[in-house]
Amino acid sequence: SQVQTGFGRLGSHFWGFQTHDVLPDIVTMGKPIGDGHPLAAVVTTREVTDSFNNGMEYFNTFGGNPVSCAVGLAVLDVIEGQDLRGNALSVGNYLMDAFRAMQARYEVIGDVRGMGLFLGIELVTDRKTKAPATEFARAVSNGARRRGVLMGTEGPHDNILKMRPPMIFSKRDADHLLAVLEETFADVARTLG
């Protein structure tokens, strides 16, 4: 699925699967292609498509809707015309560098990972054992929300701060995010110890 990692969000490639040097037989894509308009697509190899050529055809009531197709093409034009993939790479690298600097200051940050504008900060109570700091992560997520920045917690223990800002996210926006994170981390560290 390229719902979260496609359309240049990772910065280095247009499709997330390209980072693994594979060519899938089926690719699904959704939300980003419509940028708020309900639109999704399935792309397959010729072999998969031909397998439907057995008397039972695939049917979709809204497939090929001209308005939706126009929206999808306009979104692709903006992604390419405004070099949003390049922006994701540049701003994402900027954020990763800043997150690594925060990791040096906050023992609770066990790992920083991601590509482009698909980022995560793993919070742990112990860097050696990687024991999850679930309460700290929830407190940071809630504290950031109170300061106007939305981020979710993910992972089996909800201890990873997951950030997927819009593709138009600028360095100025990144600086605001970083200021909110610094303030929130300091506040939560004082509160939870």
Residue ranges of each PLM-predicted region?
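Conserved N-terminal phosphate-binding loop of PLP-dependent enzymes in the Aspartate aminotransferase
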Residues: 2-193
